[in-house]
UniProtKB/Swiss-Prot annotation:
Keywords, ordered alphabetically: Ribonucleoprotein, Ribosomal protein, RNA-binding, rRNA-binding
InterPro entries: Ribosomal_Su5_D2-typ_SF, Ribosomal_uS5, Ribosomal_uS5_bac-type, Ribosomal_uS5_C, Ribosomal_uS5_N, Ribosomal_uS5_N_CS, Ribsml_uS5_D2-typ_fold_subgr
Family: Belongs to the universal ribosomal protein uS5 family.
Organism: Rickettsia prowazekii (strain Madrid E)
Domain remark text: The N-terminal domain interacts with the head of the 30S subunit; the C-terminal domain interacts with the body and contacts protein S4. The interaction surface between S4 and S5 is involved in control of translational fidelity.
Superkingdom of origin: Bacteria
UniProt subunit comment: Part of the 30S ribosomal subunit. Contacts proteins S4 and S8.
Protein name as it appears in the record: Small ribosomal subunit protein uS5
GO function term, MF aspect, one: structural constituent of ribosome
S5 DRBM domain location: 11-74
PROSITE patterns per UniProt: RIBOSOMAL_S5, S5_DSRBD
């Protein structure tokens, strides 16, 4: 009996960054390519990965495989935004994610937009502070997404019922 593969066709792939890197050796320079890819199913799962190879397509393939391995599930509110405001940090990069009303759209810059599009978020406001390095911003965004919790998971953790958890008690901005 063969293993059932996950539906890979449903994953969207966004190439966030490609760099040509150089290694200086005795005989001259060796060139390679580095790629950073974000993949997601547009339904609450997203991952990011880095790959390096002598050709761009190989680097992109390695990055996609790494992103699939690092996929994570993010709780979404009404399948369109996040449950509460959250702050993520990575090095000198700081990212603030805020929930938004329906119809607001994705207000985010650069690599954060790629993450939210792959995640399936339709309404969010995001602000990056500090470093605008692609790797740092993506890492900070994933740090913020890891801090998200649904009211159901908070209720389970506190050994309460969902209706006992008020909105104010689980909305917090970690500064």
């Amino acid at each position: 009996m063969s293993k059932v593969k996950k539906n890979e066709e449903a994953l969207s792939e966004v190439l966030v960054d490609v760099n040509r890197v150089t290694k200086v050796v005795k005989g001259g320079r060796r060139f390679a390519f580095s790629a950073y890819v974000v993949v997601g199913d547009k339904a609450g799962r997203v991952g990011a990965g880095h790959g390096k190879a002598k050709e761009v397509n190989e680097a992109r393939g390695k990055a996609k495989q790494a992103a699939k391995k690092r996929m994570m599930k993010v709780p979404l509110y009404q399948n369109r935004t996040i449950h509460h405001d959250v702050v993520g940090k990575s090095g000198a990069a700081k990212v603030i994610l805020r929930r938004a009303k329906a119809g607001t759209g994705v207000i985010a810059g650069g690599s954060m937009r790629a993450i939210f599009d792959s995640l399936g978020v339709h309404d969010i406001v995001a602000k990056s502070i500090g470093s605008t390095n692609v790797y740092a911003m993506i890492s900070a965004t994933f740090d913020a997404l890891n801090k998200l919790a649904s009211p159901k998971s908070i209720a389970i953790r506190r050994d309460k019922k969902v209706h006992e958890i008020s909105i104010k008690s689980y909305i917090q901005v970690n500064e």
